[in-house]
């Protein structure tokens, strides 16, 4: 008796459904992507009980003729590719011909479709089998209703999460598709309640506002960079806007939402030292590339892709984000969010505006500078507007600011393919931090300073940490550092297994200034160290660098140097409760203005907080 048998189409579809239709969100994703491939401009999605009861997707796309509609429910039947060559130049969201038969095999499915000429087609399927065929209206487009999902696969139904969790997954999928296709009007409703409505005007900022709220959308700045093989556009949130999850970072390649950890890593590297540990930015990155450079035929869900020239793309995104932030003034406002009643839900997102009305600003009259200030204003700082502004924008730097309605052109100018050796000149660096006049200290920890724009509070430890970090980062990278001999050498003792690791990574340790000599069994002696090591903390610093090597699963010299620079800057910086003289404060602020990233310490904490004059007057009821 033969042991190898041919599985039936019904069983094959159920097996395929295990990968394609993982949960209700998978059904929504496949149906909406099919609607987009059909050139729909309006898509309506109605969900009942998080999709477990009913999923309805209605579009105004091209529709299908009767024969095509029947054929679409056969395995690997598709209109999107015709031969093997098409597989390597996929420009549509779907192409495998698995989604519809897989969905139909584990549900009750009803479809009405028409090409707009004559009567349409109305099919009813159960478990993948057509049980009814009728004529339908001639309205151009397609309507698909999926009910009783997983009715014949109880094991899959048993592992469904709560209604709240499944609805969250559906919302997440639709949000990302809406971001990838702002030219399509998408409405998502759950049990009659609107969860998302986009207007399909092609402006991704309006979609960002619909998903994250207008306040967050106004804090997102445009990104536009390109190279020979890639064009990258999108919006990235200012570093003050963070989340605890990476789920707010969206990547799209050729109109397809994807999950790709190297791209997420590239974005994080672009934000390097600007985000607190454990926090993540809100970003939307849209990549356009030749389809031959991306393989989307990796997994039936089509979320995972393989990229050619991934390293080049990684560097392009990382450097592009860094360059955008190097032209920004990133001083957050100290104002607290105001509690207010939630706004009534709107059925449409039409006519959304980013504008904030404000009186015309004029340059303030030049006032005499205090005699004690050694710093000069490199540019006149404008008077603040009497509106809620959480981030100051550089004058004449609108290209890298907020959406156009807030005073910037439609798109930011693309970043040059060839980065300059020094991205930010000394003049631009000093302009990014406004001129501030010290007026005192608070608790020996915070410096208070002022100018015509209001009050600035500076964390003195974080400020010096940033200054020293940039100094040590340069020093640690030196090939032959200036070495200083120690009068009393330092000795270190380790367990046998640790000594083996240390011996293996002597070269890496020397690259960060730790010069070890064998000194007996599992012991080492240090007779010299780079001259720039923080005085009095050499032993502790060397121990911590060695510990990093012992703890690391894989040694990355670049990362090791980075961690060493951060460690030295933290240890050598001013501590809390240290009262500074006026000249020390002024020197500290002067040095801070010359740093590359003067707004956060190496750990991502803010250095400067701003209280605008207007907000101060408002708090004291001098203005209403």
Swiss-Prot record:
Q: Which InterPro entries match?
A: DNA_mismatch_repair_CS, DNA_mismatch_repair_MutL, DNA_mismatch_S5_2-like, HATPase_C_sf, MutL/Mlh/PMS, MutL/Mlh/Pms-like, MutL_C, MutL_C_dimsub
Recorded GO terms, molecular function? ATP binding; ATP hydrolysis activity; ATP-dependent DNA damage sensor activity; mismatched DNA binding
Report keywords, A-Z: DNA damage, DNA repair
rRNA processing keyword on record:
no
The residues forming a coiled coil are none
| Signal peptide positions on this chain | none
Which ranges are annotated Basic and acidic residues under compositional bias? Answer: 358-368
Q: Locate the region Disordered.
A: 355-377
- Return the Pfam families for the record: DNA_mis_repair, HATPase_c_3, MutL_C
Q: Would the keyword DNA damage turn up in this protein's UniProt record?
A: yes
Q: What GO CC terms are in its UniProt record?
A: mismatch repair complex
Record GO biological process: mismatch repair
Stored NCBIfam families = mutl (TIGR00585), PRK00095.1-3 (NF000950)
What the record says about family reads: Belongs to the DNA mismatch repair MutL/HexB family.
The free-text function statement in the UniProt record for this protein reads: This protein is involved in the repair of mismatches in DNA. It is required for dam-dependent methyl-directed DNA mismatch repair. May act as a 'molecular matchmaker', a protein that promotes the formation of a stable complex between two or more DNA-binding proteins in an ATP-dependent manner without itself being part of a final effector complex.
Q: Please give the name of this protein.
A: DNA mismatch repair protein MutL
Gene behind this protein: mutL
């Amino acid at each position: 008796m033969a042991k190898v048998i041919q599985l039936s189409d019904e069983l094959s579809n159920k097996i395929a459904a295990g990968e394609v239709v993982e949960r209700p969100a998978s059904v929504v994703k496949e149906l909406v992507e099919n609607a987009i491939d059909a050139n729909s401009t309006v898509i309506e999605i109605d969900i009942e009980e998080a999709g477990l009861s009913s999923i309805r997707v209605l579009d105004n796309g091209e529709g299908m003729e009767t024969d095509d509609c029947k054929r679409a429910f056969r395995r690997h039947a598709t209109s999107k590719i015709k031969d093997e060559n098409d597989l390597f130049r996929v420009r549509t969201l779907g192409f495998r011909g698995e989604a519809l038969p897989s969905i139909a095999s584990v549900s009750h499915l009803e479809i009405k479709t028409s090409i707009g000429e004559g009567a349409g087609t109305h099919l009813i399927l159960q478990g993948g089998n057509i049980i009814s065929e009728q004529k339908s209206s001639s309205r151009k487009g397609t309507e698909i209703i999926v009910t009783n999902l997983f009715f014949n696969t109880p094991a899959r139904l048993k592992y469904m999460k709560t209604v709240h969790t499944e609805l969250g997954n559906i919302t997440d999928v639709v949000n990302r598709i809406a971001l990838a296709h702002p030219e399509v009007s998408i409405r998502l409703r759950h049990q009659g309640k609107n969860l998302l409505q986009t207007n399909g005007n092609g402006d991704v900022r309006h979609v960002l506002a619909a998903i994250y709220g207008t306040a967050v959308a106004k804090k997102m700045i445009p990104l536009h960079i390109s190279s020979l093989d890639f064009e990258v556009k999108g919006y990235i949130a200012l570093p003050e806007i963070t989340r605890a999850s990476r789920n707010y970072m969206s990547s799209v390649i050729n109109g397809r939402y994807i999950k790709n950890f190297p791209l997420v890593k590239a974005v994080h590297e672009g934000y390097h030292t600007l985000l607190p540990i454990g926090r993540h930015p809100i970003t939307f990155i849209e990549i356009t590339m030749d389809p031959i450079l991306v393989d989307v035929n990796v997994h039936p869900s089509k979320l995972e892709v393989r990229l050619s020239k991934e390293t080049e793309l990684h560097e392009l995104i990382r450097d592009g984000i860094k360059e955008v932030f190097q032209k920004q003034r990133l001083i957050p406002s100290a104002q607290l969010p105001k509690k207010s009643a939630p706004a009534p839900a709107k059925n449409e997102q039409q006519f959304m505006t980013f504008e904030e009305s404000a009186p015309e600003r004029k340059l303030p009259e030049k006032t005499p500078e205090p005699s004690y200030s050694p710093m000069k204003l490199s540019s006149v700082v404008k008077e603040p507007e009497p509106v809620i502004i959480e981030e100051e924008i550089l004058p004449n730097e609108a290209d890298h600011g907020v959406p156009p309605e807030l005073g910037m052109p439609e798109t930011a100018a693309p970043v040059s393919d060839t980065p300059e050796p020094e991205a930010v000149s000394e003049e631009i660096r000093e302009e990014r931090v406004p001129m501030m006049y010290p007026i005192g200290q608070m608790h020996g920890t915070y410096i208070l300073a002022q100018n015509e724009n209001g009050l600035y509070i500076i964390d003195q430890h974080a400020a010096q940490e940033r200054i020293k970090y940039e100094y040590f980062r340069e020093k640690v990278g030196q090939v032959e550092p200036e070495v200083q001999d120690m009068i009393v050498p330092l000795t270190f003792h380790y367990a046998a297994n640790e000594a083996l690791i240390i011996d293996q990574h002597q070269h890496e340790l020397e690259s960060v200034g730790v010069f070890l000599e064998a000194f007996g069994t599992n012991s080492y002696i240090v007779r010299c160290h780079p001259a720039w090591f923080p005085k009095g903390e050499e032993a502790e610093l060397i121990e911590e660098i060695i510990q990093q090597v012992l703890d690391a699963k894989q040694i990355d010299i670049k990362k090791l140097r980075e961690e060493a620079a951060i460690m030295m800057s933290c240890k050598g910086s001013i501590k809390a409760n240290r009262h500074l003289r006026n000249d020390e404060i002024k020197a500290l602020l002067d040095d801070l203005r010359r740093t590359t990233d003067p707004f956060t310490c190496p750990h991502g904490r803010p250095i400067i907080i701003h209280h605008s004059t207007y907000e101060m007057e408002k708090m004291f009821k001098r203005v209403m």
